[in-house]
C-alpha cells in the first residue's frame, strides 16, 4: 500500500508539473506576443516617421532644385541677351564700315573716271602733236634733202654710224666695269674661302735638315767606328752612300747626304752597330740590310697611316709606298709629305665650301707631289713624273690626274680641281715659315729681282717687297703710257721666269702715276 501511495504521489506531482509547464508556456507565449506586437507597432510608427521626414526633405530638395534651376535659366537668359546685344552692336559697326567703304569706293570710282577722261583727252592731244611732229619732220627731211643734196637713206646711214660708235663706247665701258666688278667679287670670295681653309686647318711643322747627328756613348767609340786604317768608315760610306763626318764634337758623329732615305738607313745602321758593339765590315753590311728593311717597313706604314687619316680609299700599294717615301723628301726645307697632307686638307676644305667633291680634292692634294718620291731617279719634272706614275698604278679619276700633272702649268687642263690644288699648294708653300732658304741666296734673289726691273727703259724705281714675293715698279709717266705698262709687266714676268729660281710665285706690280698741279691766284 505504501508503494501505491508513493506511486500516486509521483503521478500527481508529475501531472502538476506538466500543468504548470503548460501554463508557463502559454503565459510566456502571450507575453512574447504582446511584446512583439508592441515592437512591431513601434517599428511601424518609426517607419512612418522616417517616411514623413523623407517626404518633407524631398519636398525641400525639390523646392531648392527648382529655385536653382530658375536662377540658372535666368542667368543663361541674361548671358544670351548680352551676347545678342553685343553681336547686334558688332553687326551694326560692320554695317557702318561697309557703308563707309562703299562711299569711298564710289568717290574713287568717280575720281578714276574723271582721270580716265583727262587721260583720254591727253592721248588725243598727244596724237595730234605726233601728227604735227611727223608733218614737221617730213617737211624738215625734205628741206634737208634739198639743202644737203643727200637722200633719206644716206642721211639715215650717217646717223646710224654715229649712234653705233656711241653705243660701242658705252658698251665697252659697261663691259669693263662689269669685268672689274666680277673680278673684285671673285677675288673677295677666293680670299674668304682660302682664309676659311687656313683657319680651319692648322698643323705643326718642323723644317728638315740635310744632316743627321748620331749620339755616341763615349768618344772611344769614334775610333772603333773609324776602324784599323779607316776600313770601317770606308765600308760604311761605300755601303750606305752617306758621308760619315767625325770631328771634335764630343760624343757625336754627323751623317751628311742629300738623300734623306739613304741618310735614315745609315743612321739606323750606325745606331745598331753602336748598340751591338761589334763594328767590322761584315757586320756593317749585315746591319745595313736590317736597317734597310726597317726603313722600307716604316715607309709603307707611314703611307698607310696618312691614307687612313685622310680617308682615301682604293690606292695602289705602290702609290701608298711612294707616299711614305715623301716623308724623307724636302723642298726648300719643307717636308714634302707634311706639305702634301696640308695641301690635301686645305683643298678638301675649299672644295667643301665650293660644293665640290671633297674626297677628290683630298686625293689630288695628297698625290700632287708624288713625282718627288722618284724625281732624282727619273728624268723630267716632278709633276709630269707624278702624272705618269699615277696612270701606271691605276689611278683612273681624270680630275686627279690633271691636278697632278698640271699643278705647275706644265700641261693643259680643264679641271676645277687643278685650280684648287694650285691654290692650296701656293697657300701651303707661301705661308711664313713653311719654306726656308739661306740668307745669302735670299739677298741675291731680291737684288736680281730689282736688277731685272730696273733694266727696262722708263723705270724710275723698283722695290722687292713681301720677302721677294712681290716687285713694285714705279715708271716715268712721260716715257711709259697706260698701254705700255701692261706690256712691260708681261716682259718683266718672262725675264723673271727665265732668269730666277724661286719658291711659289712673284707678283709684278707696275704703277704709272700722273700728277697735275695748278695754283689759284
From Swiss-Prot:
Tell me the ranges covered by the HD domain, including all copies.
336-430
What the entry lists under Pfam families is as follows: HD, KH_1, RNase_Y_N
Q: How does it sit in the membrane?
A: Single-pass membrane protein
Cited InterPro entries: HD/PDEase_dom, HD_domain, HDIG_dom, KH_dom, KH_dom_type_1, KH_dom_type_1_sf, Ribonuclease_Y, RNase_Y_N
Chief location bin: membrane
Q: Name one GO molecular function term.
A: RNA binding
| Gene Ontology CC: one annotated term | plasma membrane
EC number in record = 3.1.-.-
Q: What keywords are annotated for this sequence in UniProt?
A: Cell membrane, Endonuclease, Hydrolase, Membrane, Nuclease, RNA-binding, Transmembrane, Transmembrane helix
**A single GO BP:** mRNA catabolic process
Ranges annotated as spanning the membrane: 10-30
Q: Where is the KH domain?
A: 210-270
Q: Which domain of life is it from?
A: Bacteria
Q: What does this protein do?
A: Endoribonuclease that initiates mRNA decay.
Q: Which HAMAP family match?
A: RNase_Y (MF_00335)
* Family of the protein in this entry: Belongs to the RNase Y family.
What is the protein name for this chain? Ribonuclease Y
Write the lineage as a comma-separated list: Bacteria, Bacillati, Bacillota, Bacillota incertae sedis, Caldicellulosiruptorales
Q: Which gene encodes it?
A: rny
Amino acid at each position: 500500500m505504501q508503494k501505491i501511495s508513493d506511486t500516486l504521489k509521483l503521478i500527481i506531482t508529475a501531472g502538476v508539473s506538466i500543468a504548470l509547464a503548460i501554463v508557463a508556456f502559454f503565459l510566456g507565449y502571450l507575453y512574447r506576443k504582446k511584446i512583439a506586437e508592441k515592437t512591431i507597432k513601434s517599428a511601424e510608427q518609426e517607419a512612418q516617421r522616417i517616411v514623413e521626414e523623407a517626404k518633407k526633405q524631398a519636398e525641400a530638395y525639390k523646392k531648392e532644385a527648382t529655385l536653382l534651376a530658375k536662377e540658372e535659366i535666368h542667368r543663361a537668359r541674361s548671358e544670351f541677351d548680352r551676347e545678342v546685344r553685343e553681336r547686334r552692336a558688332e553687326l551694326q559697326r560692320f554695317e557702318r564700315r561697309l557703308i563707309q567703304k562703299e562711299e569711298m569706293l564710289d568717290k574713287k570710282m568717280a575720281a578714276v573716271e574723271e582721270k580716265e577722261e583727262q587721260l583720254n583727252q591727253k592721248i588725243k592731244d598727244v596724237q595730234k602733236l605726233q601728227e604735227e611732229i611727223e608733218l614737221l619732220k617730213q617737211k624738215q627731211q625734205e628741206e634737208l634733202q634739198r639743202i644737203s643734196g643727200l637722200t633719206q637713206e644716206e642721211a639715215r646711214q650717217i646717223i646710224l654710224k654715229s649712234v653705233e660708235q656711241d653705243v660701242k663706247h658705252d658698251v665697252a665701258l659697261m663691259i669693263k666695269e662689269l669685268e672689274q666688278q666680277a673680278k673684285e667679287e671673285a677675288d673677295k670670295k677666293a680670299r674668304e674661302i682660302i682664309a676659311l681653309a687656313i683657319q680651319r686647318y692648322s698643323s705643326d711643322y718642323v723644317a728638315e735638315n740635310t744632316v743627321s747627328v748620331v749620339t755616341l756613348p763615349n768618344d772611344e767609340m769614334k775610333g772603333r767606328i773609324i776602324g784599323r786604317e779607316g776600313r770601317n768608315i770606308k765600308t760604311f760610306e761605300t755601303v750606305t752612300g752617306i758621308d760619315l763626318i767625325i770631328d771634335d764634337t764630343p760624343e757625336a758623329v754627323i751623317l751628311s747626304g742629300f738623300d734623306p732615305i739613304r741618310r735614315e738607313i745609315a743612321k739606323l745602321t750606325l745606331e745598331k752597330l753602336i748598340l751591338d758593339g761589334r763594328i767590322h765590315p761584315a757586320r756593317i753590311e749585315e746591319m745595313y740590310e736590317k736597317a734597310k728593311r726597317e726603313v722600307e717597313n716604316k715607309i709603307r706604314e707611314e703611307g698607310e697611316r696618312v691614307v687612313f687619316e685622310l680617308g682615301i680609299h682604293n690606292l695602289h700599294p705602290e702609290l701608298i709606298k711612294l707616299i711614305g717615301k715623301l716623308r724623307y723628301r724636302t723642298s726648300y726645307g719643307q717636308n714634302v709629305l707634311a706639305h702634301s697632307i696640308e695641301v690635301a686638307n686645305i683643298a678638301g676644305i675649299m672644295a667643301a665650301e665650293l660644293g665640290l667633291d671633297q674626297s677628290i680634292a683630298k686625293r689630288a692634294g695628297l698625290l700632287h707631289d708624288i713625282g718627288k718620291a722618284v724625281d732624282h731617279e727619273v728624268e723630267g719634272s716632278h709633276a709630269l713624273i707624278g702624272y705618269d706614275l699615277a696612270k701606271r698604278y691605276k689611278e683612273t679619276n681624270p680630275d686627279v690626274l690633271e691636278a697632278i700633272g698640271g699643278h705647275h702649268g706644265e700641261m693643259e687642263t680643264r679641271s676645277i680641281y687643278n685650280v684648287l690644288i694650285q691654290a692650296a699648294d701656293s697657300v701651303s708653300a707661301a705661308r711664313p715659315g713653311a719654306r726656308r732658304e739661306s740668307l745669302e741666296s735670299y739677298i741675291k734673289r731680291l737684288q736680281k729681282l730689282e736688277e731685272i726691273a730696273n733694266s727696262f727703259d722708263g723705270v724710275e724705281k723698283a722695290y722687292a717687297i713681301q720677302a721677294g714675293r712681290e716687285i713694285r715698279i714705279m715708271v716715268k709717266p712721260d716715257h711709259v703710257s697706260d698701254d705700255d705698262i701692261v706690256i712691260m709687266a708681261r716682259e718683266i714676268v718672262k725675264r723673271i721666269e727665265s732668269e730666277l729660281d724661286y719658291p711659289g710665285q712673284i707678283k709684278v706690280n707696275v704703277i704709272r702715276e700722273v700728277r697735275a698741279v695748278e695754283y689759284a691766284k
